[in-house]
């Protein structure tokens, strides 16, 4: 199965490597024609305002919103999650795709120097804790009724699912643990 990584900015190579390790074909997505080729898409972390500018420059902004509305499975990490959110509490003027019913706070867990790692309980992927890496991570402050919380940190959601959308505040691509990427492939994209 061909799974894309939105390839305009962020942890692109790391996600491509994880897709390959799950036994699927990775594709670096930089155009609408490449977007049309994939069975699922990963939106990496990076800097959300830069990502918006580049997505619009390469005509991916509206195409991605339409693809997600049409059922394209998406997994978004960190800044990717910010782009999907319905609302950014501390930057209300920032545009989003608005397809995930959450309200987030950018850099909610602190700036770069406040980055940290912690073990998370994620029952959907097994009993062994997942070592999560948070880098300038957003906090999910509110979730709509259609959003399922898969994991929390200090009572705040950090891994959520809504239909064919999976999103995390943390960066599983920076670990060697494939379980979240495998969950995306098996449970969100499903079998073709």
From Swiss-Prot:
<dbReference type="Pfam" id="PF01174">
    <property type="entry name" value="SNO"/>
</dbReference>
<comment type="pathway">
    <text>Cofactor biosynthesis; pyridoxal 5'-phosphate biosynthesis.</text>
</comment>
<dbReference type="InterPro" id="IPR002161">
    <property type="entry name" value="PdxT/SNO"/>
</dbReference>
<feature type="binding site">
    <location>
        <begin position="135"/>
        <end position="136"/>
    </location>
    <ligand>
        <name>L-glutamine</name>
    </ligand>
</feature>
<comment type="function">
    <text>Catalyzes the hydrolysis of glutamine to glutamate and ammonia as part of the biosynthesis of pyridoxal 5'-phosphate. The resulting ammonia molecule is channeled to the active site of PdxS.</text>
</comment>
<dbReference type="GO" id="GO:0008614">
    <property type="term" value="P:pyridoxine metabolic process"/>
</dbReference>
<comment type="subunit">
    <text>In the presence of PdxS, forms a dodecamer of heterodimers. Only shows activity in the heterodimer.</text>
</comment>
<dbReference type="GO" id="GO:0042823">
    <property type="term" value="P:pyridoxal phosphate biosynthetic process"/>
</dbReference>
<dbReference type="GO" id="GO:0006543">
    <property type="term" value="P:glutamine catabolic process"/>
</dbReference>
<feature type="active site" description="Charge relay system">
    <location>
        <position position="173"/>
    </location>
</feature>
<keyword id="KW-0456">Lyase</keyword>
<dbReference type="GO" id="GO:0004359">
    <property type="term" value="F:glutaminase activity"/>
</dbReference>
<keyword id="KW-0663">Pyridoxal phosphate</keyword>
<dbReference type="GO" id="GO:1903600">
    <property type="term" value="C:glutaminase complex"/>
</dbReference>
<feature type="active site" description="Nucleophile">
    <location>
        <position position="78"/>
    </location>
</feature>
<protein>
    <recommendedName>
        <fullName>Pyridoxal 5'-phosphate synthase subunit PdxT</fullName>
        <ecNumber>4.3.3.6</ecNumber>
        <ecNumber>3.5.1.2</ecNumber>
    </recommendedName>
</protein>
<dbReference type="GO" id="GO:0005829">
    <property type="term" value="C:cytosol"/>
</dbReference>
<feature type="binding site">
    <location>
        <position position="106"/>
    </location>
    <ligand>
        <name>L-glutamine</name>
    </ligand>
</feature>
<comment type="similarity">
    <text>Belongs to the glutaminase PdxT/SNO family.</text>
</comment>
<dbReference type="GO" id="GO:0036381">
    <property type="term" value="F:pyridoxal 5'-phosphate synthase (glutamine hydrolysing) activity"/>
</dbReference>
<keyword id="KW-0378">Hydrolase</keyword>
<feature type="binding site">
    <location>
        <begin position="46"/>
        <end position="48"/>
    </location>
    <ligand>
        <name>L-glutamine</name>
    </ligand>
</feature>
<keyword id="KW-0315">Glutamine amidotransferase</keyword>
<dbReference type="InterPro" id="IPR029062">
    <property type="entry name" value="Class_I_gatase-like"/>
</dbReference>
<feature type="active site" description="Charge relay system">
    <location>
        <position position="171"/>
    </location>
</feature>
